[in-house]
Curated annotation (Swiss-Prot):
The protein's annotated pathway: Protein modification; protein ubiquitination
Residues of the BTB domain: 12-81
Gene: kctd6
Organism: Danio rerio
Name by which UniProt lists this protein: BTB/POZ domain-containing protein KCTD6
Keyword Chloroplast tagged: no
Role: Probable substrate-specific adapter of a cullin-containing E3 ubiquitin-protein ligase complex mediating the ubiquitination and subsequent proteasomal degradation of target proteins.
Coiled-coil regions listed: none
Subunit relationships: Homopentamer. May be part of a cullin-containing E3 ubiquitin-protein ligase complex.
Key word Kinase present: no
One Gene Ontology term from the biological process aspect of the record: protein homooligomerization
Length: 237
């Protein structure tokens, strides 16, 4: 294999199925730490398993893998302020044998300045699809925004009145929009505008993930999730 082919292989996208959660990244990211389990796995020194779709399968905690992958991408550990699964994440780091991450998790220093905290926005798109139609037919789509930043939810209510007729559920920390089979394309438009609005409020995308489910004999459900974060300063009473 010449240098050009090898370089293309390292940057070529690869999809992993980790406990039912799909993640797409590059081989070079997975091999950032050659002595790790993932480094050995994608060097050919470790046996691999594929799922029915041909994705590499790892039978581990799919939710926590987002932090593993982000560390591989940036060599930095960033966790939500209210993160409560540190012991579980340590076990995942031990499993993947990522020594720098293990050291970060054992470092007692705070991840952020003590006078700041992290605000989080979760955006999810749930789409139910008919299994037996060709082309695939959308049955229903739901778009949900979840956050404790009430000013953001108020801004969405005030600036996205075009989609008010689709607003089906509003709660203290959540707002949802529902779209039927004839107007699911409007969900795409709303989602694009929402992502732009959220980023303009100072949030950056921390993580994206996709989850496929088959709940009924004639339906498939596809869930897309985006996590946005920003730092905020604590206000003294």
């Amino acid at each position: 294999m010449d240098n050009g082919d090898w370089g293309h292989r390292l940057t070529h996208p690869v999809t992993l199925n980790v406990g039912g959660h799909l993640y797409t990244t590059s081989i070079s990211t997975l091999q950032r730490y050659p002595d790790s389990m993932l480094g050995a796995m994608f060097r050919g020194d470790f046996p691999t398993t594929r799922d029915a779709q041909g994705n590499y399968f790892i039978d581990r905690d799919g939710t926590l893998f987002r932090y593993i992958l982000n560390f591989l991408r940036t060599s930095e550990l960033t966790l939500p302020v209210d993160f409560t699964e540190l012991d579980l994440l340590r076990k995942e780091a031990d499993f993947y044998q990522i020594e720098p991450l293990i050291q970060c998790l054992n470092d007692p220093k705070p991840l952020y300045p003590l006078d700041t905290f992290e605000q989080v926005v979760e955006l999810s798109s749930t789409r139910k699809l008919s299994k037996y139609s060709n082309p695939v037919a959308v049955i229903i789509t739901q778009l949900t925004i979840t956050t404790k930043v009430h000013s953001l939810l108020e801004g969405i209510s005030n600036n996205f009145t075009k989609w008010n007729k689709h607003m089906m559920d509003t709660r203290d920390c959540q707002v949802s929009f529902t779209f039927g089979p004839c107007d699911y394309h409007q969900e795409v438009s709303l989602r694009v505008h929402l992502m732009d609005y959220i980023t303009k409020q100072g949030f950056t995308i921390r993580n994206t993930r996709v989850h496929h489910m088959s709940e009924r004999a004639n339906e498939n459900t596809v869930e897309h999730h985006w996590t946005f974060c920003r730092l905020a300063y604590k206000v003294e009473d």
